[in-house]
Amino acid sequence: PHLYPAVWRPPAAAETAMATAITLPADSNQALGIAQYAIDFIGGKYGDSIDPAVWERIEMFHTDSVMCGISALAMKTNAPCVLRGEAFDYPDPRGAKVFGSSQTCAPEKAVVANAAAVREWDSNGTVFGYNPSIPGHTAGEFGHNDFYGVVVAAAQVTGKVDGKTALRAMICLDEIRGRLAEVFSLKSYKIDHVLHGAIASAAVYGALLGASPEEIESAIGMTVAHYVPFRAIRAGKQLSDSKGSSAAISTEAAVLSMRRAMRGFVGPKDIFRNPESIFRFFEPTTGTPKNQDLIDITLGNKVRWGPGPSPFNLVLTHSGSDFSVCGMHFKIGLYEHQSAGALEGLVTLLVQNKALSTAKLEDIEKMNIVAYEPAFGIIGDPAKKDPKTRQSADHSMAFIVSRMLQKALEKGGVAASNDETWKALMLSPYDYGKEALFDPKTRALMQKITFEHGGPEYDAKYPDGIPTSMDIHLKGGQKFSSGLVMYPSGHARNTAANLKGLLATKNQMLGDLVFKDKAAYDKFISPLIGMKGLSAAQIQGIYDFDFSAMKEHQCIDGEREPTSKL
């Protein structure tokens, strides 16, 4: 029996249908509703009604994520290598595969390994959870496109999922996690943003494996009740593998929960209306007002802990073009996304001002960047001017901007367009390696950068855009001003950049770290780009390549313990 007042009603009664979407009301069992949506959407209930641009976008995000992942393995980054190695300790003839292997292992182990690799560079897709066209969908939670490996794992387990169905499932996964990011801000309560992706992963994995709505509801309940990841992994200056692998570990738990539910384990039901689950715990809907400054947890307040709705309605698109994935953003290289506005401003200044692009490093007198919160606090902190690790450097506005400017000035000029300049100056993993990290020229430029918080004027424009402006002063008095940048290249609302061309360059840059020749690169990337036309048999090997034939690199982060002690 359900713990809360409204027992699940048939979809016609519980869902408020729109032409292209359903709404799961706050007073319905949304966990069961998400389950039914995933089953219906992936199963084709709504017909072939997805706009071609959506198919193209999901294919691009998936390819981008995979190229990030395999290049992180090629550069011997720690967590991806550890987790990939761990997966082989769990062989499963009915399992899934890690990148670069034809050996099957427990699906949750393949998922954790592949997701950790995808996230390691912090260079794959980003969502800001902001959709003002839907009432209540502006919570602004972060998120990243880390979870596509869940779909491929399910496809490999069943052997029955073709490329088009796999892409449809990826659209579904991004829709669920993206819309949850729009209605509930996890970071406001120090919960890591990856939980929304874990919920979506449980739903989609279950739907692909033929789970019932009740089994998926059970898995979502287990994921939320047992595996809430807090932002302790991101606190202060400490950096660990847990930060980059947070999505992977949460998704491992989600897939494991789904497998347990399909074996008959019954988890908590109706988790979004559960008063002691995170949603109503942090945003009460009965007995006390929602107040982020004061959460009333008085146990004697019976109304507070009694029956009530969830804190939000949830709209999920099933047809047309207004899918969550279409509002997600690409990174044109390696950088923290909050710096994208500054990088676009820099590229524009270099293209438009020959006096700047042909200057010498010593000609730069000072630079000032004006940004919004949270960018000012996250990557503009003065303490970030002395990064000592790759992970702290890619969250340092000073380092990121200085590195790109240094590359431009050392070239002695730039191309005539923003697109070609982005391609030439694109930041690669080597820009965050041990040598680059302590490059004296980069460090000298960093000391010339100052930051300002743009105040309410800038803050109000985020997360619709990435409001940033930049001034660069040369010795002798010349000043170059970017003006306000809102939608940099890669941003979902940017219409000026040739996104396909930029991503092709990025894919090639990352692929060159992995493959020794163009033939091997083309063989690997072609199925990713043409995934919609692949058969179920071809999906089985979509992540296969000869791991032993990869280009050989030293570990990008320096020497590490080479073997496990287990």
Say what each PLM segment does.
Residues 2-4:
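Intrinsic-disorder-associated, low-complexity terminal segments enriched in Asp/Asn/His/Tyr and depleted
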Residues 8-140, 242-252, 259-566:
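Terminal-appendage/accessory-domain detector
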Residues 34-37, 146, 169-172, 176, ...:
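Amphipathic, well-ordered alpha-helical segments in soluble domains
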Residues 121-174:
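Hydrophobic alpha-helical hairpins/lids featuring a short glycine-rich hinge
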Residues 139-144, 190-195, 230, 331-335:
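Short helix-coil transition sites and intra-membrane helix breaks within transmembrane domains
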Residues 144-153, 197-204, 251-256, 339-343, ...:
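Well-ordered alpha-helical segments within folded domains of soluble proteins
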Residues 148, 155, 175-176, 225-229, ...:
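Short connector loops/turns at beta-strand edges and beta->alpha or beta->beta junctions
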